Amino acid sequence: MSLLAQLKILVVDDTTTSRLLVRDALETLGFRNIQVAADGEQAMKMMMTTPSHLIISDMNMPKMNGLQLLHAIRTYKPTARTPFVILTGSPDRAVLEEGRKLGLNNYLTKPFNPDQLRRALEAIVGRLH
């Protein structure tokens, strides 16, 4: 089994269509162990019980947005080093800079294509093994 097939990825987005698009793109790239959450609160609960190796999260969500989730992930010791990628429809430089200060690994602007996602994840996956 390849490394990609073994890695557990958590996709967090409040829009069902977006979750499915990201999941399909990940499957196209060879990832097989993909979980989904509808918001940051649900994602954090999932990470506390069954941590993933990588998180791909939408920026703008109700209850807990992407940066709030990133902060929660970084301050919870068992998940503090989990790679984190933000998806955003409107990349605000100040928000992205805040994300980098919190330990954001990368970001993608929506809409994206699978090749952009592949490039964004290659370096992260390389560091995981």
Where are these regions (language model features)?
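Acidic, metal-coordinating helix/loop segments flanking the phosphotransfer/catalytic sites
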Residues: 36-54
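C-terminal output helix
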Residues: 112-122
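Alpha4 helix (beta4-alpha4-beta5 surface) of REC/receiver domains from two-component response regulators
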Residues: 23-24, 68, 91-106
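Receiver (REC) domain active-site loop signature in two-component systems and cognate sites
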Residues: 61
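Acidic catalytic/metal-coordinating carboxylates
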Residues: 39-42, 65-71
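Conserved acidic segment of CheY-like receiver
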Residues: 6-17, 22-26, 55
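Active-site residues of response regulator receiver
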Residues: 58, 88
